[in-house]
Amino acid sequence: MMITSTNPMVYTDFPDPDIIRVGGVYYMATTTMHFTPGCDILRSYDLVHWEFIAHALNIVADTPEERLECEGANAYGRGMWAPSLRYHRGTWYVLFAANDTHTSYLLTADDPCGPWRKRELDGFYYDSGLFFDDDDRAYVVHGQSTLRITELNPELSGPMPGGLDRVIVQDDPQADLGYEGSHLYKHDGRYYVFTCHFPQGKGKTEACLMAESLDGAFEVREIIEDDLSFHGYGVAQGGMVDTPDGDWYAFMMQDRGGVGRVPILMPMRFGEDGFPVVGENGKVPQSVSVPAASCAEPVTPINGSEFIARYNAEGGVDANCLQPYWQFNHIPHNEYWSLTERPGAFRLHSGRISSNLNHAWNTLTQRTMGPVTVAEVTVDASTLHDGDFAGLAAFQGCYSYIALTRRNGRTMLTVQYKPVNDDSIFSDDDWDSPAVTDAEIMADADCMRLRAVYDFIDCKDEVTFFYRDADTPESEWCPLGTAHRMVFKMDHFTGCRIGLFLYSTKETGGIADFYDFAYSAPDTKEREQ
């Protein structure tokens, strides 16, 4: 039996996907940048329905930048990049590089659900692709513009002394972006490197290099150049995976504006000359058919409304156990958040003075979903201090939010934002300016229900904010402020996220409680037939 799913495969920010199959099960690793815990590991039985099974990475490194230790020190847009997921002789591997520490890390596990172990490698392997050959020797393809293949030692701790270490291709110096995001495979005795780039004057494309041996000449061919009729954003950067029946699929990603970089799936076969033939008639299909899973569908959602993931044997909350779809912005300061101090609520304590949302500790985030996501939460601001802000955000570099704030002993409801200077992907590197106020009113109570609607339809990329009395759920939603842009930029280098936050501008010690969170993603496209 086959099922048909429309692209994107998953309409959310899962950048730099790497997918492998072990037995009848597919596994995916994805970039998590500055969010903690990181390196999401997902599982699927049909390449369409995915569930979280682990975060392979607790933290990248215990540094001032990763901890948001002080203003001027952050890991935005850096952290955990481009994982390479492999399984070899009973061990699971994830290799990735962190640009803030300029270090490559290898994660290993006996079970993909964890626990995972972390160690550093000798050398820095940018956008690395791990590969085990038939003789168990390990290699990594890596680099930007200039791609190299480097043999690793048997301990996988660094380069093999005297081993293979060679340049396999050099991109055109005039390319808008050189080769990167590479994955290395072997099929029917040939070696394949999938890699993406921006040829001069073109969109993002995927190339494939093919050779008869790792020390032989690699032939290069563009294998897909298409934007799925979506605003010129090319589909690229990924690899290939087969089914138990021997069918092949290519997986890549596509920039989709404010929602981020989303996984794309397409059929693939090998041509008579050995090169992959990707898509349908040279194009990425709007929908793709895959074999239906022979087992029950996954039960763990990739988004949701619950804070708590599990309870202990006595029925109480396992402290610090959040659902896997929640991640903190940077390394959390655990003494300043709790799931147990107020039953059913996520509580934040103010632990330092911050100039704006980008510097706030313990902002709790969840991915938005295209084409539309709606988030609601009740915020109790009765124990805020003057100058505190607690609320619901469209969390990105040019953030916006609706929040309760305390001023001169009065509780106010405000919409604030960081202005978008232009639509380019480049950051203005302004982390410190205070937010701009769009609208502000007196709050009817210290406890209010807040709502954000994130609209990504056809790159509209706007968020609108609403409020109502928390004690009268039948009351109508009242809009506050104007619509705000959600622009994907390299400052955060991630899609816009839902954010629950508290920060102080005058004194520490304030408390905010968040409860009855509700997540919904009305999906206007048919996912399955």
Predicted regions located by residue number:
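Carbohydrate-active catalytic/glycan-binding domains of CAZyme proteins
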Residues: 1-529
